[in-house]
Amino acid sequence: MKFIIKLFPEITIKSQSVRLRFIKILTGNIRNVLKNYDETLAVVRHWDHIEVRAKDENQRPAIRDALTRIPGIHHILEVEDVPFTSLHDIFEKTLPLWREALEGKTFCVRVKRRGKHEFTSIEVERYVGGGLNQHIETARVKLTDPDVTVNLEIENDRLLLVKGRYEGIGGFPIGTQEDVLSLISGGFDSGVSSYMLMRRGCRVHYCFFNLGGAAHEIGVRQVAHYLWNRFGSSHRVRFVAINFEPVVGEILEKVDDGQMGVVLKRMMVRAASKVAERYGVQALVTGEALGQVSSQTLTNLRLIDNVSDTLILRPLISHDKEHIIDLAREIGTEDFARTMPEYCGVISKSPTVKAVKAKIEAEEEHFDFSILDKVVEEASNIDIRDIAQQTEAAVVEVETVTGFGANDAILDIRSIDEQEDKPLKVEGVEVVSLPFYKLSTKFGDLDQSKTWLLWCERGVMSRLQALYLREQGFSNVKVYRP
């Protein structure tokens, strides 16, 4: 099988040296993402495209899907690479591939050619188009706005029959820009802002301020791991968790009610800046949008920024909430965000929307900053690739099984789309579908006399959810890994 990777247009307008560097980085990213799919896979870079070749046909859908989620790729052409001897030979190889798709449709032929030939691209379009029109009675040529466009590429003595075109996510390859640290909460905003910086070529590390115990951290780890695994797995990244409950307690005790929200955000920026400096990260990323809540007015944002020299990026600053939710749905984080626990440890009854610097600094004089230093020093830092292993260790009391007993039932916790694409069928046992994002509210409605074997494709989500259900008091759960 062969795929032709077309570059994001902004890459092609760079200077020669920058363009070559971007293409080289993108080629490396593709290799890193695809290396586990096929050992024979080859990635070859060219000036205007990248080729991916593999032999394992069973991996075709997985490779194609993975390519559509790598930043820097505009679109992917799935092609059949065959030799040809003449114009008529090109037509004969095109006809069987496109006959069914063109029946009853209008069409045109578009050709791109590289190398020296006795014919022009237009001559190929006319010859092949005329032949298809003659041999498919219900098809009709239409050069403008046709139902189907037959795309052919000719490279020297090889014909690339384009079997399908798939859109990528665009942007710049990860690694072409410097690292950033995303302040992730698991909600709509922070997930989308993290994705936007990945798409712009940054390696995104994650910093989580835990205000709500283990269950909250498990949920946020799921979001971070999902984003990394889906869009950024070409690079190693960190997940830093800071226990912020002592800081919240100090704020509640020492800070005036109206100033609490801004002071909390300033403490978070201070802590995140220390983490960023420790790991050589150039900027922080937040999901703040102008005017969305009281701490996100221009006055308050300026005061929050003032506590650190570290650059703070806010990619969603002008976005509406509805648009942010649409983006979350598009990238697959909406379901996580909708079910994420909300912890409102610091909510002022009358929060200020126009904080005064002198008042904020006066309130912060009451704060014991050794508490902030201590929680930053004690912050946990893990490689995001180890989240699965750490979760496995954390749920050691939850048995992992390869088979099932008479009183067992399998619980498929994948998303609805995944279940529809690949339905789980196991003989001899009941299989029940309950997406992971409904477990917190719906698991208790299931037959609790049964033992439920949680299953997902990679096993990460099932282990995370097993730990969550254990914490909620359910002992009748196991992890199913056949």
UniProtKB/Swiss-Prot annotation:
Boundaries of every Rhodanese domain copy: 404-482
Xref: InterPro entries: Rhodanese-like_dom (IPR001763), Rhodanese-like_dom_sf (IPR036873), Rossmann-like_a/b/a_fold (IPR014729), ThiI_AANH (IPR020536), ThiI_fer (IPR054173), ThiI_N (IPR049961), THII_Thiazole_biosynth_dom (IPR026340), THUMP_dom (IPR004114)
Compartment(s) of residence: Cytoplasm
Keyword terms, alphabetized: ATP-binding, Cytoplasm, Disulfide bond, Nucleotide-binding, Redox-active center, RNA-binding, Thiamine biosynthesis, Transferase, tRNA-binding
GO cellular component: cytosol
Main location: cytoplasm
Positions of the THUMP domain: 61-165
Annotated pathway: Cofactor biosynthesis; thiamine diphosphate biosynthesis
Catalytic reactions on record: [ThiI sulfur-carrier protein]-S-sulfanyl-L-cysteine + a uridine in tRNA + 2 reduced [2Fe-2S]-[ferredoxin] + ATP + H(+) = [ThiI sulfur-carrier protein]-L-cysteine + a 4-thiouridine in tRNA + 2 oxidized [2Fe-2S]-[ferredoxin] + AMP + diphosphate; [ThiS sulfur-carrier protein]-C-terminal Gly-Gly-AMP + S-sulfanyl-L-cysteinyl-[cysteine desulfurase] + AH2 = [ThiS sulfur-carrier protein]-C-terminal-Gly-aminoethanethioate + L-cysteinyl-[cysteine desulfurase] + A + AMP + 2 H(+)
Membership in a protein family: Belongs to the ThiI family.
PANTHER family cross-referenced by the UniProt entry: TRNA SULFURTRANSFERASE (PTHR43209:SF1)
Name of the protein in question: tRNA sulfurtransferase
